[in-house]
Each structure stands twice: as C-alpha cells, then as structure tokens.
Amino acid sequence: MNQRIEEVMLANVKRDVARRKRHFATSVVVLSLLAVAWYVCQIEFQKLGAGLPRLWSFVVQMFPPDLSDLDVILKGAGETLAMATIGTIFATIIAFPLALMAARNTCPNKWTYRVSRAILNASRGTETFVYALVFVAAVGFGPFSGVLAITFHMVGAIGKMFAEAIEPVDQGPLDALALTGASRAKIIRYGLIPDVMPHLIASVLYIWEFSVRTSTVLGIVGAGGIGQTLKDTVDLLEFNKMITVLAVVLLMVSAIDFISDRLRYLILDTKREGFETLPANN
C-alpha cells in the first residue's frame, strides 16, 4: 500500500516538474519573440520625448479651427458615408451565397466548403488599404475605387460572420421541409433565412459601421472620401483646417457607431422578446 502511494506521489512530482519545464520553455520563447519584435520596431522612447515639443507646436497651430472649407469637408464626409454604404451592400450581396457554401450544414460538398472558405479567408486577409491601392491603379482616382476596395475586403468579413450564424441553426425545421419535398432554394428561403435574419442584419450593421471608419482614410491613396481632404491639409501644413476635418470625422464616426449600436440592439432584443412571448406547451 505504501509503495503504491509512493508511486502515485512520484508520478505527480514528475508531472509537476514536466509542467514547470514546459511553462519555462514557453516563457523563454515568448520573451525571445518579444525581444526580437522590440528590436525590429526600433523602440526608442527618447525620440518620443524629443519630438513632444514639435508635436505641441502642431497642436497649437490647430487652433482656432478654420471653417472656411467646411462645405468641402462635409461633401467629403458624405462621399465617405456613401462609399461605405454602397460597398457594404455590394459585399453583402456577394457574401451571402458564399456563406451558404462555407457553412457545413448548407454546403453541397466538402470541396465547395473548402473553396468557399479559402475565398473568404483571402478576401478578408488583404486589408482595404491594399485593395484601394490596386483599384486606384486599375480604375483611377475617385470614390469608385474606394467602393471596390471596401467590397472586396468586406466580402470575407461578412461571409465569415454569416457562415458562423448559419452553422448553429437547428436542423429540425430544415429536415422537415426536406421531407415535404421542398427544393433546396425553398428550404433556405423558408427554413433558414427567417431563423438567422436578425443575426445577419446585425452583422451587416456592424460591418457598415466598420466600413465607415475604414473609408475615412482611403482618400489618402486617392480612393475618394474625406481622406483626400485630410491628406491635402497635412501636405499643405494647414493644421487649423486639419482639426476641422478630424472633428467632422469624429462626429460622423460617433454618430454611425451610435446608430448602428442602437439598431443592432433593437433587432437582437426584438428577436429575444419574440422567443420569450411564445406560449408554453401544455
């Protein structure tokens, strides 16, 4: 009996030692990677300290704000909002069929699933800014390049969110429709979409909000929107106009965030209330 207890204790000690070694090795690897990253990024806080007076001089030059070009700035803000809206709509139209093929419970076969997932990963794996550079070279300067950049990036983001909303759906109603002889299109239309629609709308609203924030800087590379105005003020050292542009961007993004957040809350809360008010089975 004592020998058995000693064996168990020895085994526990060995496991504890092995665990400590793994933790130590993991810590060494993580700290080494952080040290390499620190070196590569050339972190030098003394440069920040030396640059603070220059930064403060920029801040002083921002005031008072120059409102002489407010109409141009507001036009750029409207263009930015339009780019984000149209780009999100295009992305949603493309993403929905891809999401159906990228969800395990609705994809026709494993190859379709893998290809669709690869497309979505590639789409969202490339930043909107990179797409903007490509489309500016392809179709020229202007908001159309920004719309295309937002569309191509957001297809991957929306498609992934849609697929994740579709996969957990209860298969019971879908199987019941299939037993009645309903076509695949009707099963999706009457069995799947009503169940996931609130989550799909909430996802689109979130992406729209994100697209507005993203599109504010696309003008820096010539893809339209208020970013071009911001770049012009920086290039011309018009800091008092720059603060006006930044204020408009902040107000626009804050308003869109608030509207999107409220709409998502109302949509998802309505769905929860709908389930809560269902009559109980007797």
Swiss-Prot record:
CDD domains xrefs: TM_PBP2
TM stretches of this protein: 23-43, 81-101, 130-150, 239-259
Superkingdom of the organism of origin: Bacteria
PROSITE patterns xref list: ABC_TM1
GO cellular component: plasma membrane
Keyword line: Cell inner membrane, Cell membrane, Membrane, Transmembrane, Transmembrane helix, Transport
InterPro entries: MetI-like (IPR000515), MetI-like_sf (IPR035906), PhnE/PtxC (IPR005769)
Principal location class: membrane
Cell compartments where the protein resides: Cell inner membrane
Domain ABC transmembrane type-1 residue range list: 77-260
Database matches in Gene3D superfamilies: MetI-like
Pfam families to which the protein is assigned, alphabetical: BPD_transp_1 (PF00528)
Annotated function: Probably forms part of a binding-protein-dependent hypophosphite transporter.
Family: Belongs to the binding-protein-dependent transport system permease family.
Record's protein name: Putative phosphite transport system permease protein HtxC
